[in-house]
């Protein structure tokens, strides 16, 4: 497995998308305590994307915490032209997603939370199909896990100790 270097979020021009904001409740002896949980995706539309979650008493604070968390969890997505190098499956909890490369001009064909991740990663032509849970947290994590497992031909050649030409025949 290739070791991934930590990414400095300060040097990237990151955009953020709020995927989900939920009101969560803690029931105590004196009644109910309400807080807000936010799920946010950040990315520079140039191969860097991350997800984060945050909780707070107010929605803006929860979003702010989620953005900070997302900046700590950035990954690099290998992009070939405007799409991904190969088909990949992501799995997290009950969330399963199939991400497939697409020809130029196709656009991003993906549902809900997965679309936010793929767009902020900088992918212009890609198809995705959710095969499991439609829970936003599981879908986003499955998408990130799938994108994180992508490898380019150069990566595979380096792992096998061969040249790219040998692999491609």
Curated annotation (Swiss-Prot):
SUPFAM superfamilies, per database record: dsRNA-binding domain-like, Ribosomal protein S5 domain 2-like
Keyword rRNA-binding tagged: yes
Start and end residues of each S5 DRBM domain: 14-77
Pfam families (UniProt xref): Ribosomal_S5, Ribosomal_S5_C
Domain of life: Bacteria
GO cellular component: small ribosomal subunit
Annotated keywords: Ribonucleoprotein, Ribosomal protein, RNA-binding, rRNA-binding
GO MF annotations, alphabetized: rRNA binding; structural constituent of ribosome
Subunit structure and binding partners: Part of the 30S ribosomal subunit. Contacts proteins S4 and S8.
Protein family per UniProt: Belongs to the universal ribosomal protein uS5 family.
Name of the molecule in the record: Small ribosomal subunit protein uS5
Organism the protein comes from: Clostridioides difficile (strain 630) (Peptoclostridium difficile)
Gene: rpsE
């Amino acid at each position: 497995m290739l070791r991934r270097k930590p990414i400095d979020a300060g040097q990237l021009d990151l955009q953020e998308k709020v995927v989900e904001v939920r009101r969560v409740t803690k029931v105590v002896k004196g009644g109910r305590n309400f807080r807000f949980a936010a799920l946010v995706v950040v990315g520079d539309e140039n191969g860097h994307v991350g997800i984060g979650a945050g909780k707070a008493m107010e929605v803006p604070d929860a979003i702010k915490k989620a953005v900070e968390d997302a900046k700590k969890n950035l990954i690099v997505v290998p992009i070939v032209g405007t799409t991904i190098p190969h088909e990949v499956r992501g799995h997290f909890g009950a969330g399963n997603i199939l991400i497939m490369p697409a020809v130029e001009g196709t656009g991003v064909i993906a549902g809900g939370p997965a679309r936010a991740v793929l767009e902020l990663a900088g992918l212009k032509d890609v198809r995705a199909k959710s095969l499991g849970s439609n829970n936003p947290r599981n879908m986003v994590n499955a998408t990130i896990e799938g994108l994180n497992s992508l490898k380019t031909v150069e990566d595979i050649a380096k792992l096998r100790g061969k040249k790219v030409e040998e692999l491609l025949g």
